[in-house]
């Protein structure tokens, strides 16, 4: 399955209403900075917490885009509208976009 992926240059600023950013990094990574308003569910917890994720479009992020690609594939298999952020939080930070 091809995983839908968006480059940092393709992410609208500000993020559109109705888009949920799903951060699948570990808690220690999340604590070092994350996208304001993002939902945090570590990758390994996702199967047990799938029902917590709202309907609508999802932008899935991790540190570099590998874990988020796996999660995006999983979400698509479960009927969700998900896109992986290529380059993850490293690209987000390098683009000078805000983190909290």
Q: Regions from the language model: what does each represent?
A:
Residues 1-20, 26-58, 66-100:
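Rhodanese-like catalytic fold shared by cysteine-dependent sulfurtransferases
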Residues 61:
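Short, surface-exposed ligand- or partner-binding patches at beta-edge/loop junctions that are enriched
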């Amino acid at each position: 399955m091809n995983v839908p992926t968006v480059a940092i240059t393709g992410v609208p600023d500000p993020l559109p209403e109705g888009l949920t950013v799903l951060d699948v990094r570990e808690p220690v990574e999340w604590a070092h900075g994350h996208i304001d308003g993002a939902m945090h569910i570590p990758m390994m917890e996702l199967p047990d917490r799938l029902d917590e994720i709202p309907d609508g479009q999802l932008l899935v992020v991790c540190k570099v885009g590998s874990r988020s690609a796996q999660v995006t594939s999983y979400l698509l298999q479960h009927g969700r509208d998900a896109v992986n952020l290529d380059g993850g939080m490293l690209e987000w930070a390098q683009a000078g976009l805000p983190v909290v």
